[in-house]
């Protein structure tokens, strides 16, 4: 399973980020052996995604699955959105969403916007 994440530079609520990952993990099928997080930034989102992957690695391994953090550019994620199974966008209230949110919805990717 491939999860795309992106957010705004002002977003700093790690608990909401964890909730977004819990929602994505709930879609992980039994036959899925990989959980890859493609993070399109900015840096604060990349750091949350990397921390989540590092902290979850042991638990995932015990379940016979692997987790991997991959930093990508927003352009790359937009161009390769069809490879993504789930997309999460994280922002504070009243902040605009990125173009990737619209592109992922147009491509019927399960898209969630978290703005708390």
Question: Where is each model-derived feature located?
Answer:
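STAS-typified acidic loop motif
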Residues: 2-12
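Acidic/glycine-enriched connector segments
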Residues: 10-116
